[in-house]
């Protein structure tokens, strides 16, 4: 239970000066215990010890001026940052809704839903993200969609969804997991861009940054560009026929360059000039037929194309 420095025993009976001194001592103790909890999670200490600390020893100073124990939601944020998979799995299994609830005001900048999915993508915590998504399977559809399609703070995160974060940071494993669990690829960020449009802009910048000076290593931008092309292929699997037309202006603005970068078939489809190839359409039908409850396990039953096979969706790699 939270304790309050303003209550009897905290120095309030001694007047304003004593009350202020008690408050200062309480805040100092909170800082010490918060740092101890941070270190314990960072050092991957055993789950039982972390839970004992969270329940009885570690406190933070909340927005109401009280020393409060860390909630499962706040503890999960620490586990995500430090990749403590065992602790994250425990919190999600024991407190599924509380672990994914919004943290207190001191841990967020706005009233958006819990930031755990976006944080897992940002830190590339594939294993914990997979466990979060597995936990969401048992949530009602509306609640699940609210968590998956959470829009980040417009000031700090640009109003984007977790899919935008995955595209911005080139996280193909995270993107595939999110799409397979029903994240919406058509939502726009604060700048009005869908994940596909954001990705095309980044590909355009990558192509424009190719070294041209003599002696510069031509392969320097190759790996990031290949990851973004893989992201594009994954988004294409979940983009309904006709929905890619929003990228038309971007593509037709520099047609020769995009044809060279994407290949003719993909360019024609994304620019809205032709339907997807039979192969692309067949893969769309196969992959989108997998229900979130069987994703990604059911992928093992499919004859996947080579570009999907290197993806490690377990988080163990």
UniProtKB/Swiss-Prot annotation:
- Protein's cellular compartments: Cytoplasmic vesicle; Cytoplasm, Cytosol
Substitution effect: residue 110 to S: Inhibits the vesicle-to-rods transition under nutrient-limiting conditions. Inhibits the vesicle-to-rods transition under nutrient-limiting conditions. Does not affect the abundance of IMPDH2
Keyword Repeat on entry: yes
Q: Which Gene3D superfamilies match?
A: Ankyrin repeat-containing domain (1.25.40.20)
Q: Listed GO cellular component terms? A: Cul5-RING ubiquitin ligase complex; cytoplasmic vesicle; cytosol
- Which GO BP terms sit in this record? intracellular copper ion homeostasis; proteasome-mediated ubiquitin-dependent protein catabolic process; protein ubiquitination
Record motif Important role in both nutrient sensing and binding/regulation of IMPDH2, residues: 109-110
Query: Under which pathway is this protein filed?
Result: Protein modification; protein ubiquitination
Effect listed in the UniProt record for changing residue 109 to S: Inhibits the vesicle-to-rods transition under nutrient-limiting conditions. Inhibits the vesicle-to-rods transition under nutrient-limiting conditions. Prevents the colocalization of ANKRD9 with IMPDH2 filaments
For this UniProt entry, what is the primary localization, expressed as one broad class?
cytoplasm
Keyword annotations for this protein? ANK repeat, Cytoplasm, Cytoplasmic vesicle, Repeat, Ubl conjugation pathway
Extent of the ANK repeats: 71-100, 112-141, 158-187
Q: Which GO terms describe its molecular function?
A: ubiquitin-like ligase-substrate adaptor activity
- Segments of this protein annotated with the region Disordered: 1-25
So what does mutating residue 125 to A actually do? Loss the vesicle-like pattern and becomes diffuse in the cytosol
Coiled-coil annotation: which residues?
Answer: none
Keyword Cytoplasm found = yes
The record's function comment reads:
Substrate receptor subunit of a cullin-RING superfamily E3 ligase complex (CUL5-based E3 ubiquitin ligase complex) which mediates the ubiquitination and subsequent proteasomal degradation of target proteins. Depending of the metabolic state of the cell, promotes the proteasomal degradation of IMPDH2, the rate-limiting enzyme in GTP biosynthesis or protects IMPDH2 by stabilizing IMPDH2 filaments assembly. Implicated in different cellular processes, like copper homeostasis and cell proliferation.
Subunit: Part of an E3 ubiquitin-protein ligase complex with Elongin BC (ELOB and ELOC), CUL5 and ANKRD9. Interacts with IMPDH2; leading to ubiquitination of IMPDH2 and its subsequent proteasomal degradation.
Q: What is this protein called?
A: Ankyrin repeat domain-containing protein 9
Species the sequence originates in: Homo sapiens
Query: Could you read off the lineage of the organism from its UniProt record?
Result: Eukaryota, Metazoa, Chordata, Craniata, Vertebrata
């Amino acid at each position: 239970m939270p304790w309050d420095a303003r209550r009897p025993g905290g120095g309030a009976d001694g007047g304003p000066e004593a009350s202020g001194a008690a408050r200062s001592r309480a805040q100092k103790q909170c800082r010490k215990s918060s740092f101890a909890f941070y270190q314990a999670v960072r050092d991957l200490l055993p789950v039982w010890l972390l839970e004992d600390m969270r329940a009885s020893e570690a406190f933070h100073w909340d927005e109401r001026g009280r020393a409060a124990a860390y909630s499962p939601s706040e503890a999960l944020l620490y586990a995500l940052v430090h990749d403590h998979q065992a602790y994250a799995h425990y919190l999600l299994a024991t407190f599924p809704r509380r672990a994914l609830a919004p943290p207190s005001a001191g841990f967020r900048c706005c009233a958006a839903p819990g930031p755990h999915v976006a944080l897992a993508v940002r830190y590339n915590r594939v294993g914990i993200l997979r466990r979060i998504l597995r936990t969401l399977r048992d949530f009602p559809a509306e609640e699940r969609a609210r968590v998956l399609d959470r829009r980040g703070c417009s000031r700090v995160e640009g109003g984007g969804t977790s899919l935008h974060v995955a595209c911005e940071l080139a996280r193909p494993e995270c993107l595939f997991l999110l799409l397979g669990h029903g994240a919406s690829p058509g939502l726009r960020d604060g700048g009005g861009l869908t994940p596909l449009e954001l990705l095309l802009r980044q590909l355009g910048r990558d192509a424009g940054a190719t070294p041209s000076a003599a002696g510069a290593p031509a392969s320097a931008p190759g790996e990031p560009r290949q990851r973004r092309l893989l992201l594009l292929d994954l988004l294409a699997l979940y983009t309904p026929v006709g929905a890619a037309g929003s990228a038309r202006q971007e593509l037709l603005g520099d047609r020769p360059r995009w044809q060279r970068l994407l290949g003719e078939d993909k360019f024609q489809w994304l620019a809205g000039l032709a339907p997807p190839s039979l192969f692309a359409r067949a893969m769309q039908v196969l992959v989108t037929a997998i229900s979130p409850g069987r994703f990604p396990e059911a992928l093992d039953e499919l004859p996947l194309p080579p570009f999907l096979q290197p993806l490690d969706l377990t988080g163990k790699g």
